[in-house]
Amino acid sequence: MNNQVKQHAYQAIKNAKLVSVPFPHIYVEKVLPDEFYSELLDKLPPDNDYDIYPAPYEQRHYIQLSPSRTAKLTEAVSQFWKEFEAWIHSQEFLEVLVEKFGKRLQVNYKYREKDLVKNAVSDECVRVSPRSLLVRDYQNFALGPHTDSESKFIVGAFYFPKDDSLRDFGTSIYTPKDPAVTSWPSPHMKHEDFNRVKTFENRPNTMLVFMKTDHSWHGVERKQHSNVGRDVLFWIPQIGAAAGAEIPLQLPKRWFSKPSFIDRLTTKIGV
């Protein structure tokens, strides 16, 4: 992977404004250099390279990116995705995103305490499994509000449209109509029980990244879209082992440790 591409992306992520409400997130524009983004669009795999989720999510086609899986892609695109997968699953890429959210990650310590012990690789570090899904969603795809699975801590969505024709086929964030509703395990809820705060549009060369919490409610609105397919790459590192993750990474436990009183206070007020 070209170092210029990496540095462009890292700078775009660092410059993105971190918003704390309703949960920590960033929306990055022009995350990749224009020329590289055009090449990426040309290298999107053909439909027959994708697997299909079982009902009721059969409108989502996917490729779980890993060294062994990218090797099986159509020859014309395989090398590109092999290099891209190696980059976004690198220690370097992981650390850029973790540093962006920083001590905010500690607010979930009460949920993660046992997992940090179970997945420790040393007294100081915990195992992290890099994992990504390249998906193609078709016209009737929708997802009810959910907070995401328990082993995740940061979730990224690279949007790869060719133009703005599917811009409303984005990711929405929500708050529950009952403010007391939170959920760490993350069942999929009904849209009608939530207020939509904002929809992050499916625009070319953008990326939404958010922090998993017990109130990181997000989903996809029910709408009738054209059936050309929405191309998105979900970057979803997980604490511990994960299916399909072939090269484990690690992070210092301090990123997830019990926050001090001052840390809790500054995080609460959005410092």
Regions found by a protein language model. Name each.
Residues 5, 15-18, 23, 135, ...:
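Short, functionally important structural connectors and interaction interfaces within domains
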Residues 7, 38, 116:
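Aromatic-glycine hotspot motif
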Residues 8-12, 68-69, 120-122:
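Short, flexible segments with low predicted structural confidence
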Residues 15-108:
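Non-heme Fe(II)/2-oxoglutarate
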Residues 59-65, 116-127, 253-262:
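Amphipathic alpha-helical surface "interface" segments used
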Residues 86, 94-248:
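Catalytic core of non-heme Fe(II) oxygenases with the double-stranded beta-helix
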